[in-house]
Amino acid sequence: MSSIEEIYHEAKSDKWFQGFALFCRIVLAASFFPTGLVKVMGERFAEGLPSNNPLGHYFDALYLTGYYYTFIGIAQIIIAVLILIPRTSFMGVLMYFPVIVNICVLTYATRFAGTRANTMLLLGCLFLLLWNYDRLKYLLPFKQPKTDPPVIKKPLGIRLRIIFFGGSIAILTFIIIGTFYLWEIGPGNSEAECRNQCFGSKNPVACEEFCDCIYKDGRPLDSCLAAFNKKKNIHIHYKPRY
């Protein structure tokens, strides 16, 4: 058995890691159950998000898809329940993974303010996939050699906890800080939130016009970004003559 497998089996037998895996399962289930219930009840998801917001356009269109919208809600509830049940948690995590990847891509593409939370959910899902590697490996297109019962020769003990949780804190810090500086401008979750960023902007006029483009004109995000960049470049290259 390789050293990586030894570390894996040591983590699986550690109560701290077991508790963290349970915590991740609860969080993932909690992220899907209420959102799925909203769809099943026939209500628009994220009602507080304006229709002219880039992600609001998507939610409006999705809401008008009829029974497909209901189907998504039912699927989310089923996934949440499967994740909570120990015997079916692995199946639930497998179903959760492609959905949360799609959600992450969507939120980053529309510059949604909740990208941090969705990224953390994706990381939690990846942890649970690794946690269930003893099952996952049989689904991979690789020949799996027969292994003897795990015998941990040199346990890391508390060092393993420190390395893992220290690394987790570092990753979360990177995500929080990194996403804060990811975009120069974004639509925010409301018109007021969009305009708040203009106070500290290097190009406040271009920023205000961007917010008008999004929330007053209702134009696509790419079109508004192109207009913002054009206005910004004119401001940069303009040199007044005296």
Model-derived regions: residue spans:
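Solvent-exposed, well-ordered loop and adjacent helix/strand elements within mature globular domains
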Residues: 31, 35-72
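Juxtamembrane helix-break-helix junctions at the cytosolic face
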Residues: 78-91
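Hydrophobic alpha-helical transmembrane segments
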Residues: 70-81, 97-98
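Extended, low-polarity transmembrane helix blocks
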Residues: 1-43, 89-242
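Generic signal for short, ordered secondary-structure residues
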Residues: 6, 15-16, 57, 73, ...
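Membrane-interface junctions
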Residues: 26, 64-65, 84-87
